[in-house]
Amino acid sequence: MSRNLFLSITNFIRNLESLFLPHGGHPPALALAGFQHDHSPKSSQEFSLKQLIGDGLLWAVPKHRRSVEKRLKRKFGYPEYNWKPLREKRNLRSCLQCGHDHEMGVLCPFCYQKVLKETELMQSKIQETLGLDPVDKEVIVLYEGEKAEQSTDDLKNKRIVEMKKPRPMWFTKNLLQKSTQQLSETKEVKPSDLA
């Protein structure tokens, strides 16, 4: 309030001075002899955009300064949403099989790549032997030094693909078993099967 009042009074005084003193202010209090003081108003120059803009620095100055809280939020972010400084990860675990580090709840990327390469080799071998025809029978993959454990009658309805390399230690036979069981036709439950 007081600042606005002070500014309005100073503006009023300036306007009065410009009315009564048209030469741009108070007359000189001390004048040296022999020097002539010219009070003529400056000649009006043509308006140019280059003079108005100048080097353009003042045109990009912000009007209001940001508060300390906003500056710190812009610098560091919000802890609950997006925290910009680096933080240590506390959810890293080392794989029990290969020893590489990975995040908790995520498969080990190194082990996953091993399985992916082996699966691609199996798929390419199946594609070489069986072609691109639709598979109407179950496919059995046998590695070097393995024999089919099923009888010949069961093998008639299945296709066999042989890999010319030994089975990797981590790739056990139960990985090729189906994970879903077929529905049983009998609905009777024997007392020995309850527990």
Swiss-Prot record:
Zn(2+) binds at residues 95, 98, 108, 111. It comes from the Eukaryota. The keyword NADP does not apply. The keyword Metal-binding applies. InterPro entries: Mitoribosomal_protein_bL32, Ribosomal_zn-bd. One of its GO terms (molecular function) is structural constituent of ribosome. It is found in: Mitochondrion. GO terms for biological process: mitochondrial translation. GO terms for cellular component: mitochondrial large ribosomal subunit. Keywords: Metal-binding, Mitochondrion, Ribonucleoprotein, Ribosomal protein, Transit peptide, Zinc. Belongs to the bacterial ribosomal protein bL32 family. Component of the mitochondrial large ribosomal subunit (mt-LSU). The mitochondrial ribosome (mitoribosome) is a large ribonucleoprotein complex responsible for the synthesis of proteins inside mitochondria. Component of the mitochondrial large ribosomal subunit (mt-LSU). This is Large ribosomal subunit protein bL32m. It comes from Drosophila melanogaster. The lineage of its organism: Eukaryota, Metazoa, Ecdysozoa, Arthropoda, Hexapoda.
